[in-house]
């Protein structure tokens, strides 16, 4: 995910972030399935998706902590 995309995610609402997180988790599931069956063309995509999931989870957690303060 590029820096510009991260800035856009930080300004989006939590419902959009949760939806995007669900989409990425589904994509990761499909990529792992393709890897197991030997059909995955770009194994680096798994790493990219996992990193994007972590970034979105971090943004969601930052918002939760900001609300508590």
Curated annotation (Swiss-Prot):
Entry keyword Ribonucleoprotein: yes
Gene Ontology CC terms: cytosolic large ribosomal subunit
Entry-linked SUPFAM superfamilies: Ribosomal protein L29 (L29p)
Xref: PROSITE patterns: RIBOSOMAL_L29
Keyword Iron: no
Biological process (GO), any one: translation
Record key words, sorted: Ribonucleoprotein, Ribosomal protein
Gene3D superfamilies (alphabetical): 1.10.287.310
Pfam families (alphabetical): Ribosomal_L29
Gene Ontology MF term list: structural constituent of ribosome
Family note: Belongs to the universal ribosomal protein uL29 family.
Descriptive protein name: Large ribosomal subunit protein uL29
Species annotation: Clostridium perfringens (strain 13 / Type A)
Gene from which this protein is expressed: rpmC
